[in-house]
Amino acid sequence: MSNFTAADVKKLRDLTGAGMMDSKKALTEAEGDFDKAIEILRVKGAKDVGKRAGRTAANGLVAHSGKALLELNCETDFVAKTDSFVALAQQLVEHGERSGVNSAEELLASKIDGKGVAELVQEQSAKIGEKLVLNRFAKLDGTVAVYLHRKAQDLPPAVGVLVQYTGKTDEAGDADARGVAMQIAAMRPQYLSRDDVPAEVVESERRIAEQTAREENKPEAALPKIVEGRVNSFFKDFVLLEQASVTDNKKPVRQVLAEAGVEITRFVRFEVGQA
């Protein structure tokens, strides 16, 4: 006969976040000793975290606090929408914004109330039963607009964008910058301006464009113009200021911003499961 009650099992679950069967087994093994049961669960959790390390954390959410953005990954969308997972992400991004860290590595090495963030994530992994990864963290200075996108109403945000801007910084300016953040979320630019594209990337695009044109048997005299056109198409696809604006596809983003009196100086885009 067990020397603990259903209320004891519930209390242990509430205290540790462990499942009902795990809590019951721990109390049975501990012969009703509450502190020993907690220790048993902590040991089991630590072992399970090690087993989970080889699994893939491809789900999760993007959280923000003011001018900071964070991506926290888990294994299933079921966990991604739980209150405890959402709360952990929010706690971490708020701490990151306050503490002055600038990367996920720095955030993991920092402490919350004396406990290391890496240890806190590992503890939550043990409680939840899935591999958790604090994948990315970024923070911008100055005036910043934010946009978060949900891929389904019952899921937390999976895409997050921060846009740092100058110029018109009133309510209208914020609306314009947020519109650009929505463009970034949807169109996935990799660079802000042509000047930000590494020279080796441009050169690679030129080589590919020329090789493709030759394989298509294009006239030799036409190659320079064809190559230039295809490189410009690359810029229009991957450079924010060169993209067609989603609000007016007859104008590039740079023209829309110039007319609005807003200048984008930097942006950050996180999407769950993508680099």
Curated annotation (Swiss-Prot):
Listed transmembrane segments: none
SUPFAM superfamilies given in the database record: Elongation factor Ts (EF-Ts), dimerisation domain, UBA-like
Compartments, as annotated in UniProt: Cytoplasm
Pfam families noted in UniProt: EF_TS
Annotated stretches, region: Involved in Mg(2+) ion dislocation from EF-Tu: 76-79
UniProtKB keywords: Cytoplasm, Elongation factor, Protein biosynthesis
Major site of localization recorded for this protein: cytoplasm
GO CC list: cytoplasm
UniProt GO molecular function: translation elongation factor activity
Matching InterPro entries: EF-Ts_dimer_sf, Transl_elong_EFTs/EF1B, Transl_elong_EFTs/EF1B_dimer, Transl_elong_Ts_CS, UBA-like_sf
Family: Belongs to the EF-Ts family.
Entry function: Associates with the EF-Tu.GDP complex and induces the exchange of GDP to GTP. It remains bound to the aminoacyl-tRNA.EF-Tu.GTP complex up to the GTP hydrolysis stage on the ribosome.
Protein name: Elongation factor Ts
